[in-house]
Amino acid sequence: MRKLAFIFLVLAACYSPTLAAERPMRFWNLTRHTITEFYLAPAGTTNWGANQCKNDLDGTVDADERLRITNTAPGVYDARLVDVSKRTCIVRNLKLEAGEIFSIEERELTSCTQ
């Protein structure tokens, strides 16, 4: 019985990373405002990728909504976002992991311009 349990645990451990790789990365908007533009760049650069808000049906990410992130490898990124009040903010050193959700909270929006 122990042998069977051990085999099951080994198979489960091998299967979990596969499932995570199949799930998309997602951004969870925990700010107070709807986001109209959301860009990612490798940390420390200004090589902004495509507007990820275009991945959403209405082109925006409401407060407490999740957004599918596409064409972005796991790694450490800076994010630039624009909200409905036209405030532009940079959030640095976000860790994006395959199949995981990362979030930005209002209190993290310290580098903003209007």
What are these regions (language model features)?
Residues R32-G44:
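Short, ordered, surface-exposed loop/turn motifs in non-cytosolic proteins
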Residues Y15-A20:
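Sec/Tat signal peptide C-region and signal peptidase I cleavage site
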Residues R26-T34, N71:
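Asparagine-centered strand-capping/turn motif at beta-strand->loop junctions
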Residues V82-C112:
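Structured interaction patches on ligand/partner-binding surfaces of diverse proteins
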Residues A21-M25, E65:
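Structural beta-strand segments of beta-rich domains
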Residues W48-A73:
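Intrinsically disordered, low-complexity Pro/Gly/Ser/Thr-rich segments with frequent PxxP/GP/PP motifs
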Residues L4-C14:
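Sec-dependent N-terminal signal peptides
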